[in-house]
Amino acid sequence: MTTDAVGGVWTYSAGLASALAAAGMEVHLVVVGPPPGQEKRAMLRDPRIRLIESNLALEWQDAAGDDLPDARRFFEDLEDTIQPDIIHLNSFREANFDWFAPVGVVAHSCVNSWGLACQDTEWLSEQKWQHYTRAVAAGLNRAHAWVSPSQSFHDIICGLYRPSSPGTVIWNGISPAASPPDSKRRFILSAGRLWDAAKNVSALARASRGLDWPVFVAGPQSDHPAYDRGELILIGNLSHSALRSRMQHAAIFVSPARYEPFGLSVLEAASAGCALVLSDIPTFRELWDGAALFVDPADDCALHQALAYLCGDDRERARLQRAASERSERYSLARTAEAYRALYQRLLATQSRSFTPQNIEVHA
């Protein structure tokens, strides 16, 4: 299983690898990009998970494919050494390599869908990004199966790349949080890369002015563009355990994101009993309709009003906290792992005969 230690893919892959290992599988978790720090390594406690570092470039950081020859050699040698039964790729380009084992690709994100959501696409016509686009499309077609973490993002991928097989949807999942304290604290929490336009933190900064409660934002702050921070309290890039601890105490969690293929931090906040205020985008509607307040991500005034309303209405806030917690149980790690195990079994069953990707239908 490939992964990266830069964003939410690490949380997803560490959780899934741990669940698969607990079910008796041996997982070789191969890191592409910068190596994980000690806190992230500590998330891998099962001895049946072997962590392998590659020193290869991340797909979106090597749009022109300069690193591809080294990556191809690295993975060919690794497959020859390990002799895996299944190749689970959490990026696209590696699906174009010559694998012996059946290959599944998970579409966690892509540069083209990010650009469209952020209305920032002019640079995608550059030659290196055209190369990236062709590699993504080829990887989806070359894989024996491909997966999306939400139906909404599945539809986006289909519209952008027209893959030859229909793909399937397996929702991400997490282990349940510890029971939240009896009394939540009166603060609002958000999380995301401040420099990432998709996270829309600048809208939250504008909406934060005049709120009765403090608004804390966790996430990396380096290299982000200058903007008016409003009344946000920036608390930096917390460890995963520290962020989940904050969620245990936060009364409200807000994500005004313009783009989110799934949103693991929202799920973690819901599991911790936070009331959710979310941007009205298809992914969040799919996953949280009826269990959150929704606002137009382009309407700062509506975002301010929604947050002010929940700060002042104890009954509605408590109702949404319960609704989010109950909905989060739908997205369990156990259910996700079982869906992937079923997918792997179908891939193995087709290995010895003519393979047709359309035959695979696995849903969580």
Residue ranges, per PLM feature:
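Short alpha-helical donor nucleotide-sugar binding micro-motif in glycosyltransferases
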Residues: 140, 245-250
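Active-site proximal beta-strand in glycosyltransferases
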Residues: 86, 98-121, 126
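Conserved donor-binding/catalytic core segment of Leloir-type glycosyltransferases
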Residues: 180-199, 205-212, 216
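Helix-loop-beta element that forms the nucleotide-linked donor phosphate-binding surface
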Residues: 141-142, 154-174
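Aromatic "clamp/platform" in nucleotide-sugar-dependent glycosyltransferases that forms part
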Residues: 258
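Conserved acidic donor-binding segment of nucleotide-sugar-dependent glycosyltransferases
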Residues: 236-237, 278, 292-301, 309-314
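Membrane-proximal helix-turn-helix segments that form the acceptor-binding/catalytic region
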Residues: 111, 125-146
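N-terminal strand-loop element at the rim of the active site
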Residues: 3-6, 22-65, 153
